[in-house]
Amino acid sequence: MDEGGGAGAAAAAAGNAAGAAVHHNARSAEDVFRDFRARRAGIVKALTTDVEKFYRQCDPEKENLCLYGLPNETWDVTLPAEEVPPELPEPALGINFARDGMIEKDWLSLVAVHSDAWLLSVAFYFGARFGFDKEARRRLFTMINGLPTVYEVVTGIAKKQTKVSNGSSKSNKSNPKPSKQSNSNSKPAKPPQPKDEEDSGPEGAEDEDQAYMCGACGETYANGEFWICCDVCEKWFHGKCVRITPAKAEHIKQYKCPGCSSKRSRE
């Protein structure tokens, strides 16, 4: 349900009906975290890989619009729910009004911050609704805190936490990481290469837990996955998140992620 617009009924589907599935089926911190992670993935997608579509849908001429992350990892830009009080906490109203009055990256960062607050409010709403005790709330928060925030993904802070070294060749199979090809054309990366032995000490191991986060979904690198690096912003992406296969990457001389491509088209 990536297409925006619609009326209050669409908002109900985005927020209330979507939350009903969690309400009836989930009773554990792990279930609520799965819902949080899916909604977060949808919002990250709206603000990164689908940013051009998201930008168009946030027309300042329309009424107060909200960005919803849905439990199926998609997103929706629509009006808030009509019922008062709403079944679920509502996201920030009127995100579209500030679109043309701000630098685009600042506007996206603002939406990201409000989205982080909304995601937390929905997760802990479910926690209260299901009667989570102190330990369940702590477990839920710990799992949530293990992911970078939407703001960190959108602004690139998550990526900057650890510098990516180019062209590594020595192997340490226990600490794999993506490796960008070091040729002059900066072609997209092949499946990630392992980590240098010299970086495998305690400090390197600590950084490894936070490094190599996908610029689209925010998830960390897992051994054997195909990743690709944008030659403009130098963010890494799962091939599946940006619809690039290893075969397709072979024929790309300079790869631009969806965010950089759409930004240049609007300049």
UniProtKB/Swiss-Prot annotation:
A Pfam family per the record: Alfin
UniProt keyword Nucleus present: yes
Site (Histone H3K4me3 binding): Y221, W227, D231, W236
Matches recorded under InterPro entries: Alfin, Alfin_N, PHD_AL_plant, Zinc_finger_PHD-type_CS, Znf_FYVE_PHD, Znf_PHD, Znf_PHD-finger, Znf_RING/FYVE/PHD
GO CC field: nucleus
Record flagged with keyword Disulfide bond: no
Chief location category: nucleus
Low complexity bias: start-end ranges: 165-188
Compartments where found: Nucleus
Biased composition (Acidic residues): 196-207
Listed GO biological process terms: chromatin organization; regulation of DNA-templated transcription
Cross-referenced Gene3D superfamilies: Zinc/RING finger domain, C3HC4 (zinc finger) (3.30.40.10)
Stated family: Belongs to the Alfin family.
Domain text: The PHD-type zinc finger mediates the binding to H3K4me3.
Function: Histone-binding component that specifically recognizes H3 tails trimethylated on 'Lys-4' (H3K4me3), which mark transcription start sites of virtually all active genes.
Name of the molecule in the record: PHD finger protein ALFIN-LIKE 7
